[in-house]
Amino acid sequence: MKITKLTTYRLPPRWMFLKIETDEGVVGWGEPVIEGRARTVEAAVHELGEYLIGQDPARINDLWQVMYRGGFYRGGPILMSAIAGIDQALWDIKGKVLNAPVWQLMGGLVRDKIKAYSWVGGDRPAEVIAGIKTLRQIGFDTFKLNGCEELGIIDDSRKVDAAVNTVAQIREEFGSDIEFGLDFHGRVSAPMAKILIKELEPYRPLFIEEPVLAEQAEYYPRLAAQTHIPIAAGERMFSRFEFKRVLEAGGLAILQPDLSHAGGITECAKIAAMAEAYDVGLAPHCPLGPIALAACLHVDFISRNAVFQEQSMGIHYNQGAELLDFVKNKDDFKMEGGYFQPLMKPGLGVEIDEEQVVARSQGCADWRNPLWRHADGSVAEW
């Protein structure tokens, strides 16, 4: 079997799908994208495609090394996202050829189900509480929400009070009936993170995500030493070599590699195994589409240290398409009691509605994240 063609489709809300075709008619699907940089990743996919045409898709490990080491310059979000989507599609092909789900090819299940959590949007406490109530009606009891607005290096205590007030009202409304993580989104400096985390401790969040940017990872162990709240990060780390440094430094309780950003299934399975050796949990980052989610689930179901799985159903970014709009086998993604079950169909287990993908990709607008500024006019972290 030989690879014959790679086709990319930019889609709403901010996704990109990749179709890899073979000379025997077997097709694999992947989801290579950086939110807001889809065209750049698309160019990288087609550059890497030059290595792949005419090659055997079954040699996933070799093709991964060719894509990663074939160029003198490597790593980073663009290249690793391109590799990630290609890697997903190659695993999809392998599973279809062997008539087995990817988790089966990687050694089989370590669990029967995996807890899912849902994003909750809203800028005011009442909006967040209303969102949680709606999501509880469809079975969720675990959530993630933005922990705060953008903060300067040293900022107003009123912003800290506002963030704490939101969390306090959520805990008062729901008590211990729900769990929630708080995403600082890299918006907070180390000095402000120390203050904010301390103020949030009485409300027992499940975790604090990206308390500072990955570029400031040296603060993770320092912040962790000052709190009992688990610290999570990893969505902006792109290879096992970056994760190696934070694991060795300590401080993180949960790693959050993104299966569409960090080299795909092949790389993230290695990252998961590294994390297990350090007694660190795994919670793959996934605010993206169904192919990315399927890839995450296969890694979750082979990784003993997987703790829960993010998914984008109802997320505020999903303007123009919902999580399963391009999927035929929607029932396979149905959650029971807030848990995902293993995907049982061959490959990734996602049946893509190709006709709709082609139609919706025509004239798809480019998504860009907002550009925020502080009160003084300087650029803020979004």
UniProtKB/Swiss-Prot annotation:
**Cofactor(s) for this UniProt protein:** Mg(2+)
What's an example Gene Ontology biological process for this entry?
D-galactonate catabolic process
Record's Pfam families?
Answer: MR_MLE_C (PF13378), MR_MLE_N (PF02746)
**In the record, what terms sit under GO molecular function?**
galactonate dehydratase activity; magnesium ion binding
Q: Which domain of life is it from?
A: Bacteria
Site features described as Transition state stabilizer, chain residue numbers: E310
What positions does UniProt annotate as the active site of this protein? Answer: H185, H285
Q: Where is this site: Increases basicity of active site His?
A: D258
Please state the pathway this protein functions in, per its UniProt record. Answer: Carbohydrate acid metabolism; D-galactonate degradation; D-glyceraldehyde 3-phosphate and pyruvate from D-galactonate: step 1/3
Name the InterPro entries on file.
DgoD-like, Enolase-like_C_sf, Enolase-like_N, Enolase_C-like, Galactonate_deHydtase, Mandel_Rmase/mucon_lact_enz_CS, Mandelate_racemase_C, Mandelate_racemase_N_dom
Q: Which UniProt keywords apply?
A: Lyase, Magnesium, Metal-binding
Under which main EC class is this enzyme filed?
lyase
**Which CDD domains does this UniProt record tie to the protein?**
D-galactonate_dehydratase
Which of this chain's residues are annotated to bind Mg(2+)? D183, E209, E235
Q: Which family does it belong to?
A: Belongs to the mandelate racemase/muconate lactonizing enzyme family. GalD subfamily.
* Additional facts recorded: Reaction proceeds via an anti dehydration.
**NCBIfam families according to UniProt:** PRK14017.1
| Function, as annotated | Catalyzes the dehydration of D-galactonate to 2-keto-3-deoxy-D-galactonate.
What is the protein's given name?
Answer: D-galactonate dehydratase
